[in-house]
Amino acid sequence: MALVSAVPLNSKLCLRRTLFGFSHELKAIHSTVPNLGMCRGGKSIAPSMSMSSTTSVSNEDGVPRRIAGHHSNLWDDDSIASLSTSYEAPSYRKRADKLIGEVKNIFDLMSVEDGVFTSPLSDLHHRLWMVDSVERLGIDRHFKDEINSALDHVYSYWTEKGIGRGRESGVTDLNSTALGLRTLRLHGYTVSSHVLDHFKNEKGQFTCSAIQTEGEIRDVLNLFRASLIAFPGEKIMEAAEIFSTMYLKDALQKIPPSGLSQEIEYLLEFGWHTNLPRMETRMYIDVFGEDTTFETPYLIREKLLELAKLEFNIFHSLVKRELQSLSRWWKDYGFPEITFSRHRHVEYYTLAACIANDPKHSAFRLGFGKISHMITILDDIYDTFGTMEELKLLTAAFKRWDPSSIECLPDYMKGVYMAVYDNINEMAREAQKIQGWDTVSYARKSWEAFIGAYIQEAKWISSGYLPTFDEYLENGKVSFGSRITTLEPMLTLGFPLPPRILQEIDFPSKFNDLICAILRLKGDTQCYKADRARGEEASAVSCYMKDHPGITEEDAVNQVNAMVDNLTKELNWELLRPDSGVPISYKKVAFDICRVFHYGYKYRDGFSVASIEIKNLVTRTVVETVPL
């Protein structure tokens, strides 16, 4: 049933679908017509199905409309349906479980005093290497207790000058200290960046030898990785990032193509805030075996690598089924008939899979993909296609949150409204099983605020009003939609989120406010030109220029990017500060979703134009397996 004609205006029936299944049930809608005042007597408006590269079209109803000419969905149903995998056999899971046990034994051996893996001259670095390896290989969820034990041991030997390679090394080591600073900080330990001061010369500069050995390059590579986990005001981290970036770029000009050069290029390009875990795992699997600077037994490396490949491919078999389910959902609601809008459900799902690779988190991955897709459709309706009269009707319908409200909507809006209504209610039911309380009212409030911000922007477009920067940002933090894409899928994860915890993660916490501000500003630096061409004048860039007469567009973009950099350091602190009373793992979900959108806006507006980078991400992380 096509979305544009899914529910005729005089129909008393509504096609209901479930979020995680596709059983259809026809239910009668209340016969009472909603008292919305603006409801037009029986007039329905269906959009023209012809695409245009212009920004203004006239439909068969004679209503002038703007469309953006977005390209079509790149992932056809046949491609999704034909995805195959050979890793569903129980034998692969059995082998992976055996390897998990063997790796646990390796962790256990590290706790044996003066054992084969615990030389007092290298035990600290060995523990850090193991933790870092299982995390980057995407298998750390199996070793949470072992990781905590290893890091507790390292932290017990941490000093104001850092650490050496082992507890009896006698001298601090840049590689171990940098890796320790990064890893301990990310796990919530209190460690000061001032340990890096002890690796500067008398002039206060980081130094290196003229000959760039592989070992020294890896030292600086870990310094670079550590420098990205910076808090506000940490000048030493800024200096470390500048030095290590210059050093590594220079090294790339001198060393031959190798796993090391591939790793350097990857980390310089994606850093931390645009680095998605499964994307890094795919890269690290390719280069893991080439690092021989640390004398870890070959057998350990082989076990870790085999386990990482198996887990990557076993997860791929689950991804295949979830993608096929998502594709059916997309067709089932008639979304393909909405040709004036973007269709990026496959890309959104991929981004979710890149930050949530636990098989138990299927509801999160599918929920994020579906909500993000529906928000994108609504964005195109409010920003371009809908008339102001229609948008007021849709806004009132969302505020009412009643399926009978569709009787007052144009045909092309009916299916969109019911898709949101059905799926949010279904997701709330899934969340209630975990949270123990009804999350529908919580979700409704967030959607009301979101739609309210959308209609405000539509009014600005309609009237030609250009707000001040502060006025724009306050509204834009809500209209970006990150709160919705974060909160509702997160409630389906397997841990409880009582009100006290939610207040530290969701609105109006500083943590949530920073994420919303960062994403609005970052998105605008990549979208403002295309938005302006469609008649959407208000953006962070244009509003900043209004507040600062005479400033050039380039300088305004630079100023907004500088704001993003500063806010990102504040976000690092809010994520990792030890006194928040909220486990980092809870906040990490929202933080990782922030990274998802950071990645999407890294090169351009990757959510309007499915760039080669996004296509490659889908291919390498959810379409292809890795050879064993």
Curated annotation (Swiss-Prot):
Binding positions (Mg(2+) 2): D379, D383
GO molecular function: magnesium ion binding; metal ion binding; pinene synthase activity; potassium ion binding
Cofactor note: Binds 3 Mg(2+) or Mn(2+) ions per subunit.
InterPro entries: Isoprenoid_synthase_dom_sf, Terpene_cyclase-like_1_C, Terpene_cyclase_plant_C1, Terpene_synth_N, Terpene_synth_N_sf, Terpene_synthase-like, Terpene_synthase_metal-bd, Terpenoid_cyclase/PrenylTrfase
UniProt-annotated binding residues for K(+): S539
UniProt: Mg(2+) 1 binding residues: D379, D383
Activity profile over pH: Optimum pH is 7.5.
Pathway assigned in UniProt: Terpene metabolism; oleoresin biosynthesis
Location in the cell: Plastid, Chloroplast
Transit peptide: 1-48
Motif (DDXXD motif): 379-383
Job description of the protein: Involved in defensive oleoresin formation in conifers in response to insect attack or other injury. Involved in monoterpene (C10) olefins biosynthesis. Produces mainly (+)-alpha-pinene (97%) with a small amount of (-)-alpha-pinene (3%).
Annotated protein name in UniProt: (+)-alpha-pinene synthase, chloroplastic
